[in-house]
Regions:
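A long, amphipathic alpha-helix that forms part
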Residues: 58-66, 98-124, 144-182, 192-194, ...
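Beta-strand elements within well-structured catalytic alpha/beta cores of enzymes
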Residues: 61, 74-80, 159-162, 166-169, ...
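Histidine-centered active-site microenvironments of extracellular/periplasmic hydrolases
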Residues: 5-14, 88-89, 171-251, 257-258
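Flexible glycine/proline-enriched surface loops and loop-helix/loop-strand junctions
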Residues: 40-47, 95-100, 146-152, 211-215, ...
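A short aromatic-rich beta-strand->coil structural motif
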Residues: 61, 75-78, 247-249, 276, ...
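Short, solvent-exposed turn/loop segments enriched in Gly/Ser/Thr/Pro and often Arg
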Residues: 1-6, 21-25, 76-88, 129-137, ...
Length: 389
């Protein structure tokens, strides 16, 4: 919403309580300055050690749920900064993973993940890897292996801590007898991050857990590709490795016990609002803040797909981020990468890892998709990338 104008802060946009950062990434250990903490409308000083954002964010979320004493519906948005860079984690969590990544390396782990995904039914057993963009594990020096294994262990520790704290929040819902009637939507905003696109990671490994750091170090392009197994590319890009993330949905009171059930109908971020509106029976407003007109609701509720009443929620789905463009229609997906001059076309049902560009074989499909993307971009004020000076 924006951190530089207080009128855009959460309490001025409809929330009753807020704790967290108004910026993007921050130090997990000592958020401060322009990337510091805010409680409601009050900027907070840098916290004293020991402090860890994932624990603190969850603890405040639990406090806010505990404060909700009546039976009115509540909406809680818990946005962890983990596992975004910088690499900050608790040492006891890091030690759980260090030996695993050093012993096996990224080639073996990538293959094991692909096999496990196929066994679980997440991907077809014949799904091929996207092209590997890094060195093989055996080509690294022993020192490089030590350093990158440690980076990945820190990243895994960040994810582990998120998992632990979600468990704490679920325990809180159960304690307050709210679990069965609470719709939980858990998702990531994008695929794994390769920034700054260096194979072994950005920043020095000695900077891990430096409280003063809000940016480096990172875990690197190679581990990001492992995290995105078996898909192509990373965060910011419009290939599946950038945009395809799982959504875990739970609502025992309304949906029953669907633990482990898969829904394979594609959806995307605009579907979250309609899903919540259907769940709560709320009405999407037409105006806000003194009569300012709100743009019409886009997206579709996910419930028809969850209940297996449809195998398609959208005629088209659209993406644009940092001049990376994509559109999906039926089995087809057209992409124009920021680094590419031409649109590409993939059959993402037969070729989920986008290995075979079939634009030349299906020009009529590509023309249709590009034309529709341009219409959508114009209607939604998507700006072209400004040329560098």
């Amino acid at each position: 919403l924006g951190m530089h104008g207080e009128e855009k802060w959460p309490l001025q946009r409809g929330f009753e309580r807020f704790y967290g950062i108004l910026s993007g990434a921050c130090s997990y250990l000592r958020p401060s300055g322009g990337r510091g903490l805010t409680l409601d409308n009050t900027k907070l000083p840098a916290p004293d050690a020991p402090y860890y954002t994932t624990d603190a964010f969850a603890d405040y979320a639990i406090q806010f749920v505990d404060e909700q004493k009546d039976d009115r519906p509540f909406f809680l948005y818990l946005a962890f900064n983990a596992p975004h860079w910088p690499l900050h984690a608790k040492e006891k969590d890091i030690q759980k993973f260090t030996k695993i990544y050093r012993k096996k390396g990224w080639d073996e782990i990538r293959e094991a993940r692909r096999k496990r995904m196929a066994k679980m039914g997440i991907i077809d057993s014949n799904t091929d890897f996207a092209e590997w963009e890094n060195r093989k594990w055996d080509e690294l020096t022993e020192q490089e292996k030590d350093q990158v294994a440690y980076r990945m262990a820190v990243y895994a520790a960040q994810v582990h801590c998120v998992d632990y704290n979600i468990g704490k929040l679920i325990d809180c819902l159960k304690k307050n007898h709210k679990m069965d009637n609470t719709l939980i939507l858990f998702m990531s905003d994008n695929g794994a991050c390769a920034e700054p696109y260096e194979e072994l990671g950005g920043g020095k490994v000695e900077e891990v857990n430096n409280p003063a750091s809000s940016f480096a170090p990172t875990y690197g392009r190679a581990w990001a590709q492992v995290s995105n197994t078996p898909f192509r590319k990373y965060k910011c890009r419009a290939y599946e490795g950038g945009i395809s993330t799982p959504l875990i949905l739970s609502w025992k009171g309304a949906l029953g016990n669907k633990k482990g059930k898969w829904c394979r109908v594609p959806g995307y971020l605009p579907d979250i609002m309609p899903t919540i509106l259907e769940a709560t029976g709320a009405k999407y407003p037409e105006t806000y803040h003194g009569g300012n007109k709100i743009y019409p609701l886009v997206g579709s509720s996910l419930f028809p797909a969850v209940h297996k009443k449809t195998d398609s929620l959208h005629e088209y789905m659209y993406w644009e981020h940092q001049n990376n463009r994509a559109i999906r229609w039926r089995d087809w997906k057209a992409i124009r990468d920021e680094k590419g001059k031409e649109w590409e076309l993939y059959d993402v049902v037969k070729d989920r890892t986008e290995r075979f560009n079939v634009a030349e074989q299906h020009p009529e499909v590509l023309t249709r998709l590009v034309t529709e993307w341009e219409r959508w971009a114009h209607a939604n004020f998507v700006l072209p990338k400004h040329p560098k000076k």
